[in-house]
């Protein structure tokens, strides 16, 4: 059932960024401002971003999903190209990954750091450095969002 809901949510037409961020955040109980902070850091909100890492792996789309997830994506009926052509899919998949890291580490900043640095015990310093950057971005984006809501 969970897989069906994930697939259904990802194929809802991309009606606008706000709708996509909010739906992914609601689905996985993650603030949409946090997802936006990650997208800003990872791709600068560039849905066409493709980056090659030092180890030769590639990251795709607005949320820079690593090709480590290729097999899992294919099992779900997706491809790396779809992460680029359907930015909402990228956002939902990133929220799903972040939720999985939160199950491992708890709903804290180390889970956010694992999104980028992975789960190796040797990478704890990198996780915390990444999380600090995301935290600053998150605070700014959340404050901007709150201010925009007041104007309505």
UniProtKB/Swiss-Prot annotation:
The keyword Signal applies. It comes from the Bacteria. Coiled coil: none annotated. SUPFAM superfamilies: Lysozyme-like. Residues 1-17 form the signal peptide. It holds the Pfam family SLT. Keywords: Plasmid, Signal, Virulence. InterPro entries: Lysozyme-like_dom_sf, Transglycosylase_SLT_dom_1. The keyword Metal-binding does not apply. Belongs to the IagB/IpgF/P19 family. This is Protein IpgF. It comes from Shigella sonnei. The lineage of its organism: Bacteria, Pseudomonadati, Pseudomonadota, Gammaproteobacteria, Enterobacterales.
């Amino acid at each position: 059932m969970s897989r069906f809901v994930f697939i259904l949510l990802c194929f809802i037409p991309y009606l606008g960024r706000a709708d996509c961020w909010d739906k992914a955040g609601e689905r996985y109980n993650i603030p949409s401002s946090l997802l936006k902070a990650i997208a800003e850091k990872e791709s600068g909100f560039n849905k066409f971003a493709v980056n090659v890492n030092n180890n030769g792996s590639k990251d795709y789309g607005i949320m820079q999903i690593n090709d480590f997830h290729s097999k899992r994506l294919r099992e779900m009926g997706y491809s790396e190209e779809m992460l680029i052509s359907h930015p909402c899919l990228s956002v939902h998949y990133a929220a799903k990954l972040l939720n999985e890291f939160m199950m491992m580490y708890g709903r804290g900043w180390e889970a956010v750091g694992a999104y980028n640095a992975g789960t190796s015990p040797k990478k704890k310093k990198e996780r915390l450095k990444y999380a600090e950057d995301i935290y600053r971005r998150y605070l700014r984006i959340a404050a901007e969002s709150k201010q925009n809501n007041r104007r309505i």
